[in-house]
Amino acid sequence: MILKRISILNYKNLEQVELEFSPKMNCFIGQNGMGKTNLLDAVYYLSFCKSATNPIDSQNVMHDQDFFVIQGFYVTDEGDPEEIYCGLKRRQKKQFKRNKKEYTRLSDHIGFVPLVMVSPADAELIAGGSEERRRFMDVVISQYDKEYLNALIRYNKALTQRNVLLKAEVEPDEELPCGRR
């Protein structure tokens, strides 16, 4: 899948950007603070439904604006066009669409536009602990294996619930609540 064109409105410091890409290689050159990293982050957002640099969606809206929109126009290996749309208004639910059809679950989109980002922060993959390496591998594998992604989501939810119970300091004789949420 090749990203042919991107349209960005009010994303971080990018007020309005329309770019067409070469299918081979694209270079971005500019002074510090011009938005090169934010452009790459917008491309990342279209793949992962979130920013690589800021997990709080509302903080990715340009200062003094109420919303952002990112649209990517792709061509599949078979030559079919695909449009990915993301829009966020402050204090509202994020909209993520493929060919104008909204996703019911964002996890359904993960892996549709495969992407691996390598940055200077990834030096921690080598020098750091195993947690960073596991997280990186989880991201890569989740794009190609939906069952792995769903299992990872369930595992993280169970881990969070376990940690809440451990912090609750329940007396040994007390009955633990059970059931589904």
Question: Can you annotate each of these PLM segments?
Answer:
Residues M1-Y45:
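Pre-Walker A-like glycine/lysine-rich segment at the N-terminus of P-loop NTPase domains
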Residues P23, M34, N38, P55, ...:
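Generic alpha-helix structural propensity
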Residues K24, A42, F112-P114, F136:
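ABC transporter nucleotide-binding domains
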Residues K36, L40-D41, D57, M137, ...:
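Alpha-helical structural signal
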Residues Y45-F48, V164:
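Regular, well-ordered alpha-helical segments
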Residues F48-E132, I141-Y144, Y148:
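Nucleotide-state sensing region of NTPase/ATPase domains
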Residues E124-R181:
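An accessory alpha-helical subdomain
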